[in-house]
Amino acid sequence: MTTLHFSGFPRVGAFRELKFAQEKYWRKEISEQELLDVAKDLREKNWKHQAAANADYVAVGDFTFYDHILDLQVATGAIPARFGFDSQNLPLEQFFQLARGNKDQFAIEMTKWFDTNYHYLVPEFHADTEFKANAKHYVQQLQEAQTLGLKAKPTVVGPLTFLWVGKEKGSVEFDRLSLLPKLLPVYVEILTALVEAGAEWIQIDEPALAVDLPKEWVEAYKDVYATLNKVSAKILLGTYFGSVAEHAALLKSLPVDGLHIDLVRAPEQLDAFAGYDKVLSAGVIDGRNIWRANLNKVLETVGPLQAKLGERLWISSSCSLLHTPFDLSVEEKLKANKPDLYSWLAFTLQKTQELRVLKAALNEGRDSVAEELAASQAAADSRANSSEIHRADVAKRLADLPVNAGQRKSPFADRIKAQQAWLNLPLLPTTNIGSFPQTTEIRQARAAFKKGELSASDYEAAMKKEIALVVEEQEKLDLDVLVHGEAERNDMVEYFGELLSGFAFTQYGWVQSYGSRCVKPPIIFGDVSRPEAMTVAWSTYAQNLTKRPMKGMLTGPVTILQWSFVRNDIPRATVCKQIALALNDEVLDLEKAGIKVIQIDEPAIREGLPLKRADWDAYLNWAGESFRLSSAGCEDSTQIHTHMCYSEFNDILPAIAAMDADVITIETSRSDMELLAAFGEFKYPNDIGPGVYDIHSPRVPTEAEVEHLLRKAIEVVPVERLWVNPDCGLKTRGWKETLEQLQVMMNVTRKLRAELAK
């Protein structure tokens, strides 16, 4: 009989219950116990959904109050020593301070989890880091599931991936792999505690196997799993996000009891594991996208596998379902307005049922689920033949693009002269990244407008009032290049998707980005174009309120692609270029309307990189081409900005330079300007604005901290090409800390300008 198991589930709840409870707790509106009760209820619901899909093992240990890698830092005693906290007795309040910072310490750095848009908290490893086991997080969840009468499989990120996703810190140079001998015994203690609590199987996830690992890291797997094999539980080694075929010989030799492989991202790797003689878990339902599977097609893969493997075949999603929205069935508007599209989709709960159908088809025969298989086939056929998806005019515009269509008219050296001639900016020009606080009033007005309780004219008036406030406050602070604050935007991607053709939206399709921050990605289901101007009216209104330059604000094509659920019937590169041409129409309209500083945000450029370096060039070529297409045809005097965050840039700087933005602003404060060093070494040719304070925390930095970062930046970047700005947009902050933070930034800027003028 084929076994069905799960690797992980969304944590926030069907209606973001965890988010709202967390934020109430942070505002001291509910007690810790009330927050714990919400979390326990969500875990139980998740397990019951998995059980309802006839799962043989539900996933435990995947639920977290903030981030599963932060949980692992606590479990291994690897929390940053700079906080002075005891990982053995860590109150929830201190757990959140690790993630969000406090008055004495900045938050743990955050970056993307492999090539997803989920963020994890980066472990800080020092040469003298000591580890200490605390298995409470995993054991408690295991026991909770057992109390419900469920068979549960704890899921823990493995030791090599844990070290791989961390960073070396401190003044002593060392390789974090050298910490492995100290870390391994702690893992043994954690796994032993789980065995003692009744775990039969434990899933140890090693997604690092899907990247280009150095030889010494690959070789370390032998000793690691020889050691972990001494624990009496059965180990399922989990891999996902890409192919691990190159490590097939190693993986077949490891003393584990089973292997999970991602057959959605890398179906071709199955051949490499044809002779595997242990449990093989086939990840056949997409854990990262929202398209319904053609179950008959999936059975063409897993049917023959079952014939070969028998009871050694397990099935699951490709990876944790963390990356998918919770439940399609609550999307009543989508069902009413786009019934065909609705029939092509599957969210987390629907994916659990797809797995239930597959298990039944394998174990009881296809006739037992004939109706479900027929419905799956009908949806696949409908999507393949839909006239809603393909547009001849969009295809023709792409086909007719000349070579080098995105090239600016002149090189940067000439453009910057034309720009400074009218901008007349001081040394160390200051700006904001884009958004200002999304207040309760803004959200209430938007909600009332969407419900039809507020007229279009009243909504516009409310947003204009907010824009006027943002402009006024920036002028008071004496910022140089202003932003309008994006009051009218619910989300930097969703806003544009709602105004572009080929996109669709959900009401409750939220996925976790980090902590309590959730995003609701648009669905790109068809060819993309821009029916009418999207931002021009708001930007020109803001520009008319001030004599200072006002930035037009657009989200770039790669980021819109990366932060959407993308159609999987044509290449992603084609979709991206379609978006770029739609944005180009907007850029040229902004320019005509007198907006001569235009920011095209690309925070997601790096997360689109394939996990294997051999595939990078192809991606970077079409990503860079798409960015250039979006600003094609601009005058030299129009200044194009871009913004990138949470990124390691060192290895893609030539590609970033080839994007040829006049100004790039980057997130650097959490890494103490570490990321900026690469730009200096590369001699990045255009203007740079490194973030001088962290906006992800409500903490107001001291002037000394901001000055320290800005002086470090001046050491790296020629001062005439250096801008001063926060790390990122200010949407999630409150007004009080926003103004205090910006005031600190401006005070330091004025001090250094005066010093440099001497």
From Swiss-Prot:
Give the reactions, separated by semicolons, that this protein catalyses. 5-methyltetrahydropteroyltri-L-glutamate + L-homocysteine = tetrahydropteroyltri-L-glutamate + L-methionine
List positions binding L-homocysteine.
Answer: 433-435, 486, 601
Q: Write down how the cofactor binds this protein.
A: Binds 1 zinc ion per subunit.
Per the UniProt entry, the Enzyme Commission number(s) are: 2.1.1.14
Record: active site = 696
Residues binding 5-methyltetrahydropteroyltri-L-glutamate are: 16-19, 112, 517-518, 563, 607
Q: What is this protein called?
A: 5-methyltetrahydropteroyltriglutamate--homocysteine methyltransferase
Amino acids binding Zn(2+): 643, 645, 667, 728
- Which UniProt keywords are given for this protein, alphabetically ordered? Amino-acid biosynthesis, Metal-binding, Methionine biosynthesis, Methyltransferase, Repeat, Transferase, Zinc
Kindly tell me the pathway this chain contributes to. Answer: Amino-acid biosynthesis; L-methionine biosynthesis via de novo pathway; L-methionine from L-homocysteine (MetE route): step 1/1
Q: Which organism is it from?
A: Neisseria gonorrhoeae (strain ATCC 700825 / FA 1090)
| Binding-site residues, L-methionine | 433-435, 486, 601
Which family, according to the similarity comment? Answer: Belongs to the vitamin-B12 independent methionine synthase family.
The function of this protein is: Catalyzes the transfer of a methyl group from 5-methyltetrahydrofolate to homocysteine resulting in methionine formation.
Q: Which InterPro entries match?
A: Cbl-indep_Met_Synth_N, Cobalamin-indep_Met_synthase, Met_Synth_C/arc, UROD/MetE-like_sf
Q: Which cofactor does it need?
A: Zn(2+)
**Class of the enzyme per the UniProt entry, highest EC level:** transferase
One BP annotation, GO: methionine biosynthetic process
Molecular functions per Gene Ontology:
5-methyltetrahydropteroyltriglutamate-homocysteine S-methyltransferase activity; zinc ion binding
